[in-house]
Amino acid sequence: MEILPVGEESLGVRSMCLYVETRDVRILFDAGVSLAPRRFGLPPHPRELERARAVRSEILRLAAAADVITVSHYHRDHFTPWYPSVYMATDGETYRQIYGGKRVLLKSPDDLNWSQRRRHYGLSKALGDAGAELIYADGGEWRVGGTVIKASQSLWHGPAGSKTGRVVAFAVLDGEERLAFVPDVEGPVEPEPVAFLKEVRPTIAVVGGPPTYLPWDIEAAIRHLREVVDLAPRVLVVAHHALRSGDWREKLAPLFEYAEKRGVEIATYASLRGVGEELLEASRKELYKREPAEALVFEEEEE
């Protein structure tokens, strides 16, 4: 199994895009990238806009090779929209290049809130027009040669009852290698994502960590992440919301100490790529001080 991190906060953008290739199938998880329109009262710095375009280019390249593309949920950093956006580095045809003719495993709309259901409607219509094969993933399992792709049942995006909606997680089983992709569970702060991980027992676990930049139950997240460490994965990748604060390592220090004692590597998308972390959003204020630039605001409306 080969794994290539594509976009994520440690790589300078909002995303969890990940490319996975086995002997049988090529999967592009959550082919999206976006930037926070405002953080610290500032719009994205030009370096962030440049990075979003670079990540989008890599997503386009890898989508061309992929057999399967996932949409774990309908937040704009996890899919490619059907309309132009500076913050998502798209024009009106980008989605066709990403999804056209592909098999797309996507979150069912059955238990979504109104906002997510609306985005699902727009995206599913666009993907149908692009000739994609749409398969609702929740609780499903697919075999491609010797590789098995599993999807979790619907999970909360954060705490139970969250207004941010629901997601599905995925696992790829390829012989002795088992990868779990568990996006946007924000900790996990609830036990259900941990139950899915215990079912999969991954050798590599990619988990959407707690939003360290917001008031949050960090203790619950660390407790659940310790349970993941107890499954003895070779690598636990802490990703996404956790890395929107420059002091995220300090806030998760008990997890690092626990994992080190048990021989589990805590990694980021950047470290898996063999590059240094660039938390561009977390350092936006410093970027404007260090590299002064006009603060350009782009008014965008979702179609």
Curated annotation (Swiss-Prot):
InterPro entries per UniProt: RibonucZ/Hydroxyglut_hydro, UPF0173_UPF0282_UlaG_hydrolase, UPF0282_hydrls
Pfam family, one: Lactamase_B_3
Record GO terms (molecular function): hydrolase activity
Family, as annotated: Belongs to the UPF0282 family.
Protein name: UPF0282 protein PAE3680
Species of the source: Pyrobaculum aerophilum (strain ATCC 51768 / DSM 7523 / JCM 9630 / CIP 104966 / NBRC 100827 / IM2)
